[in-house]
Amino acid sequence: RRRRSQGSEVNLTGQGQPCHSCGERCPGFLAHKWRKICQHCQCPWEEHGHTASNQDLERSLCRLVSGSQRDSLCDSSSDSSVEKYAWVPSGLNPVQVHHFFKCFPEKKIPYINSPGEKYRLKQLLHQLPPHDSEARYCCSLQGEEEEELLLLFSQKRRLENLGRGCVRPISGTMSGTVCQQCGHQINVGEVAVFASRAGLGFCWHPQCFTCAQCLELLCDLIYFYQDGKVYCGRHHAELKRPRCLACDEVIFSLECTQAEGFHWHTRHFCCFECECPLGGQRYIMKDQRPFCCSCYERLYAQYCDSCGECIGIDEGQLTYGGQHWHASESCFCCGRCGECLLGRPFLPRHGQIYCSRSCSMLHTKSERPFSPSQMDLSFQKETKDVGTSTNHELEGDSITNCTLAGSRTSLSVIDQTPTQAAPARSLHSSLRGAPKGFSRECPNRRSLPDLSSHTRTPTRVTFQLPSHSEIKESISFSRPSFTSSSSSDEEEGYFLGEPIPLPPFLRSPGYTAPPTHVPTSTRKQKKKKDKSCFLS
């Protein structure tokens, strides 16, 4: 009688082999004692390299499936014109081989030392699991009885269902042949795949010869025929017997555990992290892997964006836009007034949620300060994350409309040089100082700068009308006569003889507009100048 193998004696994937999926993140394959995964990256063993040569691996897998080394299953063409391929269908000339592989995506063509060759080897290990055919690759068989069941299972599948597709061009006598997969006609002269177990005249396009379950190309044209469909070895075995989700082996024991549409050996139904038994216990499935409650909370629990505490698996959770909250009145509430938002519409803004637009505007009305050199940014750049701001860029001598905290204020900025926009420091000296109603707590929004801390000599501003060629829009005046002023005869705070009032958003409580009269001496001087001033 054969001695039962422990599974660790034979392994097609050698220790330390690199992972094709993780790359350098995985230090190398380290076999789990009974799972078919790497302990480092937790990827399946077929994702890693192998110690055998390509030809030895191919022949080994074919032997596991067929029980012999028949040429029809293992030998490939030795023509020198097709040596660039790791495998080719037998019986084809180089031109037909080229037409056959032209039907496949580039990344799946098995050129030597290419991604297509790695894909082929990976699919051989996945579609034809060696532990489905030989006990020496298994680690979960209990006793010689289960080993005998595996042997009978493998022999019956090989005799009744196993086959390998044959590729040949469609001849003139077979015109009108239809693909069994897509239903489209295969033209005369095109290559097609024939499966003898399906019957005479049944054929497929090369790209349509896929497993009926996983829809992957049948590697090396090896198929298992069942009830009018072709399957890969893995999924055909699952039609006959359940497969353990943990160890990836076919279950031959009398009892097994079934949950979430999957099966396990009874002893293998355990936490993926700590491997504690889960029979009769609460568990959570994540990515088709069961976890106990404590491991799941430690690895995957989310934290509430309101209180910062961990959200337990027994607590209600609300999720929106990558944020998480406890489903409680104290956590899922308006960030301004604290009103509960459970079952109500809400407005997300700046990582907070609000019950209304007014609350969101009040909470974002005050923003962090910025230096005077950044003042031009507040008028020229659009703040995209603030829904209440609409800013427009300065264009020459045009009027710039800036909306701050929901109130629209128009500022007229005219530069002394007609071809450039007004510099930020050429604002009137009456604009110094931040208004009292603004705070600077929110870091995501700009507000007016605090210029009171910057001690500097008040800048005297001289306003000058643009020349006739520079005026983009018609200008109307309410006074019948006017005069151009200069820094020598215009009093500060006045422009063209009229007082300059503060903008509404800069007016402090109790603000009174400046007097509308000007000194008598100044008025007399202007009247004298009016006589000699004219418009061209």
Curated annotation (Swiss-Prot):
Which cellular component, as a GO term, is one annotated location?
mitochondrion
For molecular function, the Gene Ontology terms on record are:
zinc ion binding
Q: Where is the PET domain?
A: 66-175
Superkingdom of source: Eukaryota
Keyword field contains Transmembrane: no
Per the record, the similarity remark reads: Belongs to the prickle / espinas / testin family.
Location comes to: Cytoplasm; Cell membrane; Mitochondrion
List residues of the LIM zinc-binding domain.
177-241, 242-302, 305-366
CDD domains in the cross-refs: LIM1_Prickle (cd09415), LIM2_Prickle (cd09418), LIM3_Prickle (cd09420)
What organism does this protein naturally occur in?
Answer: Xenopus laevis
Where are the stretches annotated Disordered? 418-536
The record's note on quaternary structure and interaction partners says:
Interacts with vangl2 via its C-terminus. The vangl2-dependent membrane recruitment of prickle3 is a prerequisite for its polarization. Interacts with wtip. Wtip is involved in the recruitment of prickle3 to the basal body.
Give start-end positions of Low complexity composition bias: 474-487
Q: Which PROSITE patterns match?
A: LIM_DOMAIN_1, LIM_DOMAIN_2, PET
Stretches of Polar residues bias are at: 450-467
Tell me if S-adenosyl-L-methionine is a UniProt keyword of this record: no
This molecule's function is given as: Involved in the planar cell polarity (PCP) pathway that is essential for the polarization of epithelial cells during morphogenetic processes, including gastrulation and neurulation. PCP is maintained by two molecular modules, the global and the core modules. Proteins of the core module include the proteins Frizzled (Fz), Disheveled (Dsh), Van Gogh (Vang), Prickle (Pk), Flamingo (Fmi, Celsr) and Diego (Dgo). The core module proteins develop subcellular asymmetry, accumulating in two groups on opposite sides of epithelial cells.
Bias-annotated ranges (Basic and acidic residues):
438-448
Bilayer topology annotation:
Peripheral membrane protein
Name of the protein in its database record: Prickle planar cell polarity protein 3-B
Which UniProt key words apply to this protein? Cell membrane, Cilium biogenesis/degradation, Cytoplasm, Developmental protein, LIM domain, Membrane, Metal-binding, Mitochondrion, Repeat, Zinc
